[in-house]
């Protein structure tokens, strides 16, 4: 069977995602990654084993398992939606598994040295509207553990000054949830709003020439953080701030995963368990190193 899909479908393949019940950012990511699968189909044709063979094709690449799975998942979502819409007669993804991926984080969060460099740099900044903006952003990342996308989604109205909390639109959530703010976060946000005269709409707006005045994007925020990290010789990603936040809570509340989850807003305790295990491994490693401190050659 050489063709289960009319050739016209692939000319406008992005339209298949229009009726998916997903966030727009997810839809954009799907459309970004799908052309690789489309090129594969155009080259090798489409039959009941295409998805399985595509997985074998991805396995032969030098990409990480995480990247391979991202491409495989997009192809799976695409094919399942094609089947749901009646564009192909069968679900060719059935019984084809994803690549097995370790649940442990490959990248570490900011460590104590990184935090010292960053906080000293922030504390030495002069009092300007731009610097107040940076301090407000980092207070939400370091002290509240917000994800980048959550920071970018915030509106001025989400800051409940009276009760000192934020209403955060979390990852994979349909409604905003209240997040209690630490005193320093409240102070930083108040100062930022006052000095920048932000009254309504997006809490953080872009200062770049092409996006001036528009809501700060996740990509834009990641770039801001990356530039600062590079300047301070912090070899970590922007998401490392959330890793730091979660690890710090677990260090001070060891084993209290349910309590920690209330603040990190992880939907899965399993993910927190991975963080907790990493902390325990680091603690044990220090003991192992000290055990062999007298052995040298």
Predicted regions and their residues:
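N-terminal core-binding DNA-recognition domain of tyrosine recombinases/integrases
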Residues: 10-106, 124
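C-terminal catalytic core of tyrosine-transesterase DNA break-rejoin enzymes
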Residues: 139, 143, 242-267, 273, ...
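Active-site/catalytic core of tyrosine-dependent DNA strand-transfer enzymes
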Residues: 182-234
């Amino acid at each position: 069977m050489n063709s289960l899909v009319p050739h016209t479908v692939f000319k406008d393949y992005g339209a298949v995602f229009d009726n998916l019940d997903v966030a727009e950012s997810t839809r954009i990511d799907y459309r970004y990654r799908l052309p690789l699968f489309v090129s594969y189909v155009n080259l090798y044709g489409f039959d009941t084993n295409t998805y399985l063979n595509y997985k074998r094709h991805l396995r032969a690449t030098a990409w990480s398992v995480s990247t391979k799975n991202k491409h495989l998942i997009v192809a799976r979502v695409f094919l399942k939606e094609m089947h749901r819409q009646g564009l192909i007669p069968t679900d060719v993804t059935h019984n084809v598994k994803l690549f097995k991926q370790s649940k442990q984080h490959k990248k570490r969060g900011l460590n104590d040295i990184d935090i010292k460099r960053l906080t000293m740099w922030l504390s030495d900044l002069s009092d300007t509207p731009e610097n107040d903006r940076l301090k407000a952003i980092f207070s939400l990342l370091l002290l509240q553990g917000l994800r980048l996308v959550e920071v970018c989604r915030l509106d001025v109205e989400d800051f409940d000054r009276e009760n000192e909390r934020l209403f955060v639109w979390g990852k994979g959530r349909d409604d905003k949830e209240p997040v209690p703010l630490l005193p320093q976060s409240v102070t930083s946000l108040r100062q930022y709003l006052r000095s920048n005269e932000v009254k309504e709409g997006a809490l953080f707006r872009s200062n770049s020439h092409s996006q001036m005045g528009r809501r700060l994007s996740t990509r834009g925020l990641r770039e801001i953080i990356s530039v600062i990290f590079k300047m301070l010789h912090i070899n970590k990603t922007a998401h490392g701030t959330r890793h730091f936040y979660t690890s710090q809570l677990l260090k001070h509340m060891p084993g209290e995963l349910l309590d920690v989850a209330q603040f990190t807003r992880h939907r899965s305790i399993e993910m927190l368990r991975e963080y907790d295990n990493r902390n325990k491994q680091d603690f044990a490693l220090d003991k192992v190193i000290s055990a062999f401190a007298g052995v040298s050659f």
